[in-house]
Amino acid sequence: MMVDLRTLADEDFCYLTTTGRVTGAPHEIEIWFSLVPETRALYVLSGGGDRSDWVKNLHRNPEVRIAGERFGGQAREARDTDEDELARRLLVDKYESSPGRLENWRRTALPVVVDLAE
């Protein structure tokens, strides 16, 4: 059965599981996300930039869970400035009603893309 990614895109959080590059142990984080169903691109922003352990571990077969649905994928940095800005805009637009100021996060966080497997 095919999962409707449009429905999952409205969820508040996704869970990103990475494999520790040192320990080999799985690590799961809850994170805000934006999903573009047509391209199967899942966007997240790392407030810690490329220093965050989960970002360092992402390139080793990340798994994404949204509302109980699991996906494998390939992680990468945004392809170009257009995709970089798209990721930032989609995430801030989705969470703009959340408490706190998102403008600094939008400007300084590292956009990360996970291309979800079919």
Per-region residue spans from a language model:
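A short, structure-level motif marking secondary-structure boundaries and short turns
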Residues: 6, 39-40, 72-73
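Covalent nucleotidyltransferase core used to form phosphodiester bonds in nucleic acids
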Residues: 4-7, 42-56
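A generic local structural motif
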Residues: 1-3, 28-31, 99-100
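Extreme N-terminal tail/first-helix region
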Residues: 1-15
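Short, structured beta-strand-loop surface elements
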Residues: 48-117
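Short beta-strand segments
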Residues: 11-47
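Short connector loops at helix/strand junctions that flank enzyme active sites
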Residues: 9-11, 26-28, 37-39, 59-61, ...
